[in-house]
Amino acid sequence: MGMLIKNGNVVMVEDGKIRKMDVLIDKGIIVEISPEINRSDVEVIDIEGKFLIPGLIDMHVHFRDPGYTHKEDIHSGSNAALAGGFTGVLMMPNTDPPPDNATVIYYWKEKSKSIPLNILFSGCITKNRAGKELSKFYELKEAGAVAITDDGNWVADGAVFRHAMEYAAALDLLVITHPEEPTIANRGVINEGYWSTVLGLRGIPKAAENIAIYRDIEIAKMTGAKLHVAHLSTAEGVRLVAAAKKLGLKVTAEVTPHHLVLTDEALAGYDTNLKVNPPLREAEEQKALLKGLLEGVIDVIATDHAPHASYEKNVEFNDAPFGIEGLETAFPVLYTELVLKKKITLEKLLLKMTVNPAKILQLPKQGDIKKGNYANLTVIDPKLTLKVSEELLVGKSKNNPFLGRTLTGWPVMTVYQGIVAYQRLLKGVQ
């Protein structure tokens, strides 16, 4: 049976337009978009007063499966993604065992095949993410990997990374770098600056990120490979990516919601849910990130969804793991803090969360609301205001930095290939 979504404020991202339209879906495909469509032989869903947007695509999630399923697993992570309005995610490889061979990719594929979510897979750059010996990229690509990364670790050996980039270029594989020079980061836990001094915590200098980005871009220039810079957090990093783009290099970059809306001042209370890597930076760095986003230097907003069990986070700040739970609150955080405050338009925000990640990951018929595209869609209620609580979150872990915050503009329905995969039930959570 088909589906007709009526009276939605449809955001056509690439056109930069919001129009009140009806959308007809048949066999998982958008077959018609028109001001008025009337059909009695399909399921009709009236979304008067709400936005219909392309399903969000997150290029950076950690589902912790296999190896750390007390934090998250593919099913719970997928539930969190769908609740957040996402219809596509790219899984990172810091699992145990890691996907440095086809076996883990096949495990992921088998476990995710019945889930109504486009789950994409990354393979490791090096065996065991140890930075020494290359994984078999061809085998990983044949198994289904769309990118390679040692995320969580930077490939510090320049010769190894050069060979990886040459190998990836030959296979047209995207390389995602985690830019942090470890000897400069030197076991820091927050941004090096005023707040690290006040709080008595070891700082992570911005130079650790900047030096890694500089080296990786230089190797991208040597090899012609596609390089994606994960979780930018510094003004200098933005400048380096901008310079690479001006040279015509195949370099793209992402930023997280938390780096766009929070600064290191938020750590004054030693909240371990705000302990992330890269760390939250000063307001000046945050302004540069937003400027880079608006100017097109930063292509993508990605959550870096990194769940941890409560007992792992409820320890001394130095001992707590890095990472936050980010999928479920990403859109309302950005809508509340950026769109409603007129720092970015809804259309431009969605460009970074739908069209651009679809292009970078080479996902055909995804990322926008167009005739012939897959019916991967999200309904947003722009007036729905909810207080973030542990009870509201559906993922396994609750390490969300926005707990207690009141946010507006929540996903209320997620449609994957013409099937309602998630619907928000509001009773008892407002």
Swiss-Prot record:
It catalyses: (S)-dihydroorotate + H2O = N-carbamoyl-L-aspartate + H(+). The keyword Transmembrane helix does not apply. One of its GO terms (biological process) is purine nucleobase catabolic process. Zn(2+) 2 binds at D151, H178, H231. Its EC number is 3.5.2.3. Zn(2+) 1 binds at H60, H62, D151, D304. Pathway: Pyrimidine metabolism; UMP biosynthesis via de novo pathway; (S)-dihydroorotate from bicarbonate: step 3/3. Keywords: Hydrolase, Metal-binding, Pyrimidine biosynthesis, Zinc. Substrate binds at H62, F63, R64, N94, N277, H308, F322, G323. This is Dihydroorotase. It comes from Carboxydothermus hydrogenoformans (strain ATCC BAA-161 / DSM 6008 / Z-2901). The lineage of its organism: Bacteria, Bacillati, Bacillota, Clostridia, Thermoanaerobacterales.
